[in-house]
């Protein structure tokens, strides 16, 4: 395709002549200007006025309308490029959101599967101890685990800490005290002694977590630390484990006697 144009550029009273063409190869092969037998051949002249405006005079089989077509074609390309970028950005945004959702879901999943003590007690990966804020335990006298009569049956959810402790004390507590976080108050209302002093055979109770946790005190060591056995603490429902709790931490729990 040969497209050669002669341009007259008038600026500040100076006129120059130049060949305007679409590719160097065509310019080298054709220096004859407009060829009426070539449907793609054309020539034009233009001047630039004092304000920098272009004024064209066209000759040949090509018209300025093709400039608009080319412009629209470029716009179409730009639109496609913009659309592609937007699509890429959208993908990036979607991927970012998916990644965030994945992180969020992953975090929630980890929280769901994180070891818990009974029905929702707090679990510490550093010491495997329940950590609670020290609170004054409600207290009441009149009934104790040693002289209480056994309840008719274990009504707590099988596999949970409450179920295990009920059986561990021989059923000598209420069978309708609810979740572990309610046991201290329920025990006090029922006449049991509740305080912050651990003792062998007592029930350790904490309200930490969504449902709290209870454990059975197997013994108190000479240094004040305590040994407890419990169910569903860090190893899933129905699993009984034991651990030692330091004296400082042991003093922060409630104990039902």
Curated annotation (Swiss-Prot):
Bias (Polar residues) ranges: 107-116
Subcellular location, principal: secreted
Name of a matching Pfam family: CHAP
Positions of disulphide bridges: none
Annotated protein name in UniProt: Staphylococcal secretory antigen SsaA
SUPFAM superfamilies the record matches: Cysteine proteinases
Domain of life: Bacteria
Signal sequence coordinates: 1-26
Taxonomic classification: Bacteria, Bacillati, Bacillota, Bacilli, Bacillales
Compartments it resides in: Secreted
Low complexity composition-biased segments: 122-136
Tagged with keyword Manganese: no
UniProt keyword list: Repeat, Secreted, Signal, Virulence
Sequence repeats: 73-75, 76-78, 84-86, 87-89, 90-92, 93-95, 96-98, 99-101
Disordered: region residues: 101-144
Matches recorded under InterPro entries: CHAP_dom, Papain-like_cys_pep_sf
Function, in words: Not known; immunogenic protein.
